[in-house]
């Protein structure tokens, strides 16, 4: 496991947990003083943030363990499981917010000291923006699915905090239903984000192929490699930080085994240089052993 990857994803998970804890305490104070249902929505979301980030931290630490005899391909799938668990946490909180928003839109309530809630929400907005910026940087350098799921979660928090700020300002001006309507809208958006996150996690657990741009980059290296007659059966997937690449090379029948091995080994090193840490399996076929309808099926 790349130590740089391990350090970054662990730091991102710890940072998210710390921010969620601080914001939760602040929002309890603000909700207690204002009675705002949109702040209650934010408070519940922060509670889910804490649970999700703690789960994320534990799972990330587990996924960073090296491969062993029982898990020969590593523990990277744990990241997808963490993302799936987060999507379920978030969906539950979103449904709670939707129901609470509906209830309070039918029975609007006057807020107390909304300026307290506005200040706390503004602080939460800035803190979340800084966290999301850091998480985006980590995802760019690690492609961690668990950190990406956490980042999407906190991106929805950004929108939520902005909406709460507007709702509190409108309620301060006497528009009493604004608070509950904004809470309802926030709940719908968070539910959509959670379902999307869960879909991506399931696709990863089902070994979805690498993105098209990465697949094309791999194919371009292979088809232009000297000493081969063609290639076929390229299969790719990802587990945590590790890409898995498998393919068959078509080699001249008269090519010595040692030379065929060297060609495949050089190609493997070239692919690993472009995709560091990739797990690559290359099978070498005599071209005569490959059915004609399968030969050279791989194109860039």
Swiss-Prot record:
- Molecular function (Gene Ontology), one example: zinc efflux antiporter activity
User: How does this chain sit within the bilayer?
Assistant: Multi-pass membrane protein
* Compartments (UniProt record): Cell inner membrane
Residues at which Zn(2+) binds: 45, 49, 153, 157
Which parts pass through the membrane? Answer: 11-31, 40-60, 81-101, 114-134, 156-176, 182-202
- Gene Ontology CC terms, in alphabetical order: plasma membrane
Q: Which Pfam families match?
A: Cation_efflux, ZT_dimer
Sorted alphabetically, the keyword list is:
Cell inner membrane, Cell membrane, Ion transport, Iron, Iron transport, Membrane, Metal-binding, Transmembrane, Transmembrane helix, Transport, Zinc, Zinc transport
HAMAP family, from UniProt?
A: Cation_efflux_FieF
Which function does this protein serve? Answer: Divalent metal cation transporter which exports Zn(2+), Cd(2+) and possibly Fe(2+). May be involved in zinc and iron detoxification by efflux.
The entry's family comment says: Belongs to the cation diffusion facilitator (CDF) transporter (TC 2.A.4) family. FieF subfamily.
Q: What is this protein called?
A: Cation-efflux pump FieF
Q: Which organism is it from?
A: Pectobacterium atrosepticum (strain SCRI 1043 / ATCC BAA-672)
């Amino acid at each position: 496991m790349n130590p740089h990857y391990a350090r970054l994803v662990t730091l991102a998970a710890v940072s998210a947990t710390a921010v969620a804890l601080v914001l939760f305490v602040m929002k309890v104070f603000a909700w207690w003083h204002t009675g705002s249902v949109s702040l209650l929505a934010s408070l519940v979301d922060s509670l889910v943030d804490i649970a999700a980030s703690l789960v994320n931290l534990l799972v990330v630490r587990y996924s960073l363990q090296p491969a062993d005899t029982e898990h020969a391909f590593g523990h990277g799938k744990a990241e997808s499981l963490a993302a799936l668990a987060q999507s379920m946490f978030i969906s539950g909180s979103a449904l709670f917010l939707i129901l609470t928003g509906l209830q309070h839109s039918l029975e609007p309530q006057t807020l107390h000291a909304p300026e307290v809630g506005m200040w706390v929400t503004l602080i939460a907005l800035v803190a979340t923006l800084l966290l999301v910026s850091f998480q985006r940087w980590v995802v760019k350098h690690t492609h961690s699915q668990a950190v990406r799921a956490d980042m999407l979660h906190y991106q929805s928090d950004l929108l939520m905090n902005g909406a709460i700020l507007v709702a509190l300002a409108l309620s301060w001006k006497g528009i009493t239903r604004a608070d509950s309507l904004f809470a309802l809208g926030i709940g719908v958006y968070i539910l959509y984000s959670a379902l999307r996150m869960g879909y991506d996690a399931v696709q990863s657990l089902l070994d979805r192929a690498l993105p098209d741009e990465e697949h094309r980059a791999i194919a371009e290296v292979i088809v232009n490699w000297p000493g081969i007659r063609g290639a076929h059966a390229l299969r790719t997937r990802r587990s945590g930080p590790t890409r898995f690449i498998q393919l068959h090379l078509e080699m001249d029948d008269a090519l010595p085994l040692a030379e065929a091995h060297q060609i495949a080994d050089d190609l493997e090193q070239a692919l690993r240089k472009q995709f560091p840490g990739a797990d690559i399996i290359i099978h070498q076929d005599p071209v005569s052993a490959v059915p004609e309808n399968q030969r050279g099926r791989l194109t860039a």
